[in-house]
């Protein structure tokens, strides 16, 4: 089925590709002829095509032939009419600032300028909602953008991972290193109002919120992407930029714009990459001798007899009895030191006056971390394969009518051991080295009565589970201009469908492991040897349709500019067997500017969702926003400034909404309960219970958002800067009342009562300079963010330090640790935890209320209360054919909390693993240097209580990506008929500098480890 679908999609895309020149020659020969003349002109040295490194045409550049002194300005297609000859030097300017000089040849007609140059970047239009763009100087919005040429420098498939450290206001955190596990972020938004960031493998936060995702103007899931198909990723952060989203605008938006064709000769680009990946910061367990020694110590501490004799310890130490005294490194046995990653992409782009096209095909093949066995005829590794095809076609049907179609197909096949990848890792983290040998003398899987399992069998003897995922989408749009009515008037219609499916093929099986008694020679079986399953089950399926009709007007009257759009849209989505989720409404925006100096903008959204009550004012909402901008550099008092190129002050304020009600929570829902017997002739009747109480007055969440920004370029457009301050108040947040009573016998309903506030600063600095053949750039992004819970109907607390209200959103509470008890005298004079008899080496806690008892009344804010500061530094250079880039990314004022089986020793009633850091435990001999509390068997309620003891600094700086490349001279590649050849190598997660470096600052507590990737590749353009 997969191959057939892939074949059908390929045929459709190739037919569309083939259709363009045929249609142009048959239907519109005039357009085709004009394009041929244009190409001929380019080839004879009278026109130039200026693009950035993303092949995006740049309008408004001034080019000068330094020999003839003739000048020209590039049009909206990046084309400038200027004669030149071989050897002529062409100078490119932004305003009066020189960008570069380049020597021309007769067969060269394309000049590439760097979008890293702040002046060039300012010439690129700013992406807004619903496929609209606005000139950078006329934008009043808080936005930031990263282009595809930067995203391709990291061999990742997650957009969330690729944008890390590259966008101001955006903070990402990678919680897992597994490819393809980035989590499914759908097109909806969620306010992180009184909770945490979530559980995706890569979480993202835009000014503290989970943004809505929009792909080519349409709400879509953020799943696997081919980075080479992305033109840009833009974030919208303030009210005026997202007001048209209405009930989906409060959390900001991420706009992913895929690449499109241009009016240029067809270009074919092929990239092949191969990488070696290695796990980082894998928890290190103790060997058998260390484990047995510490286990004895823990048992003595708890008043128990030692479990291991001196003979046992000696056998573990010298390895004389591997069957009876095993020493198995389960991590090395089950996992591989490295895995392979292969990545291939093929892109075709081009166009003429009639049509433009871009087609991209991608294949990824990654091996996993688990070893396999020759006993199986199938793969038990956790592998990942994906196939992505995208086709974007734009048609200029006639002078007034244009349109296009976007098609996308994505297939993902992943494989896991039948026992489950994370489950096997959990077993490794919970099983000591001396638990049991791998095999018994007869070759069967070994175990003991205490474990009744075998990790190696979990890995290679449990079969496999295959996961198949499919995503298909199609977008169709038409645009008609009505200049015959009034110049600048247009009408656009858009329709889209999207379908997704995820299903598992279960070929897993149960296995048996055996305990061998060497004295009796008897094998005791645990588990059963089962036949391999053979069935499929759907994990997730859904589809959606989206329709939009917009009417716009764009026109300039002398020094007055007016732009307006109003649209109606309908978004309908289905998930599984649930009732459809529908959002619909109207929205609009109007912008006025005077001489491109003063700008005023109004935006609104009026929409609603069927998840809200139909009666009253709960279903639909009105969300307005207003903004202004002032291009200060155009004032007379700054016109002659030599150091200042551009300077814009802008601000916005507005009301936005968030659609987060849950599934029809305004309707009371019931479920079946237990059976009851009653009546003269007893009969069984099933009872019915209420679920959470319904709220018939539930409505959308809201936010009042304020933004003030300053943006400019200085020093001949070499240095650009953006600084923004924001203050966002979120209210009517859905939550259950803290002041509630159990007397009603049911959970309280969700109500619109919560309030929180997020304030902060975003900044971006970028510098670029060209010195003959050498150019370099440095770009810094970052944000300072602080949140506060304003109201949550919190129960009255007996002490002020217990109050959650007034603290940061998601703030952790616990005990304040004051070191370790050193002796019984210190214990006697200190407060003690309820239900626990303290011993020397236990953690000592601060008695905040002074009652001599440690309990919940002594829990307070723990962790860093300073504003979170996150940052990225992107730098690089080009010298002749060589290029280099690096991305550093990190965070400050951040804490991590360590717990669970990978932190505490001897969990699971004393049968769990112990770790290298447990060697630094407290003993009478190590009291002065110990960093860990005394050892215990099983759970120690005192030492494992939530406290500052297990909390550490999460500050870090990571060399996220580094790349070195070389482009072979064109004089050599053209001899073999190629446009260019570039070879490159890059690496991800190469170095990490962490304030607390025992664990990875992002991936810890037993999650799938982060991976370092060393990658080599080649790009060939035809």
Question: Language-model features: where?
Answer:
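Short, acidic Ser/Thr/Gly-rich low-complexity loop/linker segments typical of extracellular
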Residues: 68-79
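Structural motif
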Residues: 36-38, 43-58, 221
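A short, solvent-exposed loop/turn motif at the edges and junctions
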Residues: 89-105, 116-118
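Extracytoplasmic gating/loop element in the C-terminal half of outer-membrane beta-barrel translocons
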Residues: 307, 432-441, 457, 838-840, ...
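Membrane-proximal, glycine/serine-rich, low-complexity loop/turn segments characteristic
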Residues: 24-41, 110, 120-124, 130-212, ...
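Short Pro-Gly-centered beta-turn/loop motif in secreted/extracellular proteins
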Residues: 55-56, 81-88
């Amino acid at each position: 089925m997969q191959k057939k679908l892939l074949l059908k999609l390929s045929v459709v895309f190739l037919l569309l590709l083939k259709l363009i020149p045929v249609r142009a020659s048959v239907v519109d020969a005039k357009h085709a002829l004009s394009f041929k003349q244009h190409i001929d002109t380019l080839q004879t040295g009278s026109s130039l095509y200026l693009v950035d490194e993303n092949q995006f045409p740049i309008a408004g550049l001034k080019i000068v032939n330094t020999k003839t002194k003739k000048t020209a300005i590039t049009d909206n297609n990046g084309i400038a009419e200027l004669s030149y000859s071989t050897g002529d030097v062409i100078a490119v300017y932004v305003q009066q600032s020189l960008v570069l000089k380049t020597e021309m040849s007769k067969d060269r007609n394309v000049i590439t300028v760097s979008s890293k140059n702040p002046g060039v970047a300012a010439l690129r239009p700013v992406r807004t909602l619903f496929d609209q763009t606005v000139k950078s100087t006329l934008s009043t919005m808080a936005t930031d953008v990263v282009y595809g040429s930067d995203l391709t420098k990291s061999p990742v498939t997650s957009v969330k991972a690729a944008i890390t450290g590259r966008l101001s206001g955006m903070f990402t955190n990678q919680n897992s290193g597994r490819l393809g596990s980035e989590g499914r972020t759908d097109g909806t938004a969620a306010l992180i109002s009184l909770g945490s960031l979530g559980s995706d493998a890569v979480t993202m936060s835009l000014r503290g919120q989970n943004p809505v995702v929009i792909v080519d103007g349409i709400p879509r899931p953020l799943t696997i992407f081919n980075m080479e198909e992305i033109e840009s990723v833009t974030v919208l952060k303030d009210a005026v930029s997202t007001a048209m989203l209405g009930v989906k605008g409060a959390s900001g938006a991420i706009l992913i714009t895929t690449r499109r064709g241009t009016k240029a000769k067809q270009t074919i680009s092929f990239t092949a990459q191969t990488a070696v990946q290695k796990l980082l910061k894998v928890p290190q367990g103790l060997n058998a001798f260390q484990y047995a020694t510490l286990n004895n110590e823990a048992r003595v501490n708890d008043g128990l007899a030692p479990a291991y004799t001196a003979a046992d310890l000696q056998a573990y130490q010298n390895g004389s009895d591997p069957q009876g005294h095993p020493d198995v490194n389960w991590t090395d046995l089950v996992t591989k030191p490295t895995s392979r990653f292969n990545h291939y992409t093929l892109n075709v782009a081009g166009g003429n006056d009639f049509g433009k096209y871009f087609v991209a095909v991608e294949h990824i093949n990654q091996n996993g971390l688990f070893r396999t066995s020759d006993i199986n005829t199938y793969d038990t590794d956790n592998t990942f394969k994906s196939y992505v095809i995208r086709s974007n076609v734009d048609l200029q049907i006639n002078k007034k009518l244009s349109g296009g179609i976007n098609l996308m197909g994505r297939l993902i096949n992943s494989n896991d051991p039948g026992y489950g990848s994370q489950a096997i890792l959990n077993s490794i983290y919970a099983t000591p080295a001396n638990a049991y040998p791998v095999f018994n003398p007869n070759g069967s899987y070994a175990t003991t009565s205490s474990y009744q399992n075998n990790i190696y069998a979990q890995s290679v003897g449990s079969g496999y589970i295959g996961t198949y995922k499919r995503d298909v989408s199609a977008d169709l749009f038409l645009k008609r201009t009505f200049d015959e009515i009034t110049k600048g008037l247009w009408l656009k219609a858009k329709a889209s469908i999207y379908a997704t499916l995820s299903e598992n093929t279960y070929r897993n099986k149960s296995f048996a492991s055996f305990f061998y008694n060497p004295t009796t020679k008897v094998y005791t079986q645990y588990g059963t040897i089962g036949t391999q399953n053979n069935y499929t089950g759907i994990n997730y399926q859904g589809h959606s349709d989206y329709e939009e009709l917009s009417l716009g007007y764009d026109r300039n009257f002398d020094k007055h500019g007016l732009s307006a759009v109003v649209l109606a849209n309908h978004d309908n989505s289905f998930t599984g067997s649930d009732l459809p989720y529908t959002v619909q409404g109207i929205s609009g925006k109007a912008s006025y500017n005077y001489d491109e100096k003063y700008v005023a903008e109004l935006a609104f959204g009026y929409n609603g969702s069927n998840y809200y009550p139909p009666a009253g004012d709960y279903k639909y909402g009105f969300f307005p926003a207003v903004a202004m901008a002032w291009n200060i550099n155009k004032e007379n008092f700054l016109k002659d400034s030599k150091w200042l190129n551009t300077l814009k002050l802008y601000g916005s304020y507005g009301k936005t909404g968030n659609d987060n009600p849950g599934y029809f929570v305004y309707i009371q829902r019931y479920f079946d309960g237990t059976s009851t017997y009653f009546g003269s002739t007893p009969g069984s009747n099933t009872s019915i219970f209420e679920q959470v109480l319904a709220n018939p007055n539930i409505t959308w969440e809201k936010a009042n958002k304020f933004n003030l920004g300053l943006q400019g370029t200085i020093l001949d457009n070499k240095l650009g800067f953006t600084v923004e301050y924001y203050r966002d108040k979120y209210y009517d947040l859905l939550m259950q009342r803290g002041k509630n009573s159990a007397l009603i016998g049911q959970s309280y309903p969700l109500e619109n009562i919560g309030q929180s506030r997020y304030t902060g600063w975003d900044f971006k600095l970028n510098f670029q300079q060209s010195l003959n053949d050498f150019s370099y750039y440095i770009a810094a992004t970052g944000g300072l963010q602080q949140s506060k819970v304003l109201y949550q109907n919190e129960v009255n607390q007996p002490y002020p330090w217990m109050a959650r209200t007034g603290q940061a959103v998601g703030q952790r509470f616990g005990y304040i640790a004051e070191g370790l008890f050193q002796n019984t005298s210190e214990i006697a004079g200190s407060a003690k935890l309820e239900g626990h008899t303290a011993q020397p080496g236990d953690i000592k806690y601060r008695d905040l209320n002074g009652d001599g008892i440690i309990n919940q009344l002594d829990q307070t804010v723990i962790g860093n209360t300073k504003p979170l500061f996150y940052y990225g530094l992107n730098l690089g250079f080009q010298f002749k054919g060589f290029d280099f880039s690096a991305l550093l990314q990190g965070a400050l004022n951040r804490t991590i909390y360590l717990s669970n089986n990978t932190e505490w020793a001897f969990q699971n009633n004393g049968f769990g693993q112990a770790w290298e850091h447990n060697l630094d435990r407290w003993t009478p001999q190590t009291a002065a240097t110990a960093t860990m509390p005394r050892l215990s068997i099983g759970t120690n309620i005192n030492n494992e209580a939530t406290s500052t003891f297990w909390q550490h600094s999460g500050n870090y700086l990571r060399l996220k990506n580094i790349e070195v490349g070389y482009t072979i001279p064109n004089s050599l590649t053209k001899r073999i008929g190629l446009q260019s050849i570039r070879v490159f190598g890059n690496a991800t997660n190469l170095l990490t500098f962490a304030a607390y470096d025992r664990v990875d600052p992002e991936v810890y507590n037993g999650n799938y480890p982060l991976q370092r990737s060393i990658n080599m590749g080649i790009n060939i353009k035809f």
